[in-house]
């Protein structure tokens, strides 16, 4: 029963999303997950921008990219953990 490999931030404010993302990434790293999916939705893009800004300064993140076809496209971000 480790951490889930995805988190859904849709409908949250950018502050709520950042806090939830921080807690999720902490659990993912402790559980030694190597890849996780962050669902932020398409909407206005505010949550996506906040997620990407947070990921850029998060030490445990090796890389991240928007989802591809079949992964959720630009409504999700795929994160590789180091």
What are the functions of these language-model segments?
Residues 1-82:
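Long, charged, low-complexity intrinsically disordered regions
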């Amino acid at each position: 029963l480790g951490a889930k490999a995805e988190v859904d931030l849709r409908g949250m404010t950018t502050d709520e999303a950042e806090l939830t993302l921080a807690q999720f990434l902490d659990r993912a790293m402790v559980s030694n997950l190597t890849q996780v999916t962050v669902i932020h939705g398409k909407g206005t893009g505010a949550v996506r921008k906040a997620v990407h800004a947070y990921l850029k300064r998060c030490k445990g993140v090796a890389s991240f990219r928007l989802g591809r076809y079949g992964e959720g496209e630009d409504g999700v971000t795929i994160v590789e953990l180091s």
